Amino acid sequence: MAKIVAIYASPRRKGNTASLLQQAVAGAREAGADVEEIVLRDLKISPCLEIYGCAKTGKCAIKDDFGLVLEKIEKADGLLIASPVFFYAVSAHLKILMDRCQSLWVKKNWVDKAPSTKNPAARKALFISVGATKGRKLFDGIMLSMRYFLDVLDATLFKTLLYRGMDFEGDVQKHPEYLTEAKAAGYELGRILAGGKIDA
């Protein structure tokens, strides 16, 4: 059974990104995947202190919930990640997780001095993001960060769902087609990871 980790990076429990991710999770489970949900706002994860306690081992020296999250990510075949846009970047919750994954970069490039043994093609990620404005470059910064974050996680971007013009909690409910699209994307990821074909 394919294992997927779903990461909720919004500070709101019932926000638009959370609602979309819930649909993606439902779709992945419908496809037969084992999905574990992680709500970053509920965890105690310190920002990176740049003390390079990871320099010799590739393991972060800070003792908090990051270690548990990383362990789950490393065991996953797929990732579902959702974050709102804050100042043309990801939420603070996700940015902290990204920065703490510097220890992975250190492990790969300083300690092992070789790429991870994990096949990058095997771990796939679906990324969902919602922004309030309708600017053409709204997602440029966030996608650049995600590209390099997923590279550190030895993951490839399977699909992105980017939605503009939603700011207040519940706005996504006015767009049922977005929720349907998110569920379909989660289902598709689950099927692909399970080695199955997508239903027509």
Q: Where is each model-derived feature located?
A:
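N-terminal beta1-alpha1-beta2 submodule of the flavodoxin-like/Rossmannoid cofactor-binding fold
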Residues: M1-V106, F168-A200
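A broad detector of the eukaryotic-type serine/threonine protein kinase catalytic domain
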Residues: A9, V130-T133, M166
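Beta-strand-loop-alpha "switch" segments that mediate conformational coupling across diverse proteins
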Residues: K159-R164
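Short, glycine-/small-residue-rich phosphate/pyrophosphate-handling segment
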Residues: V106-F158
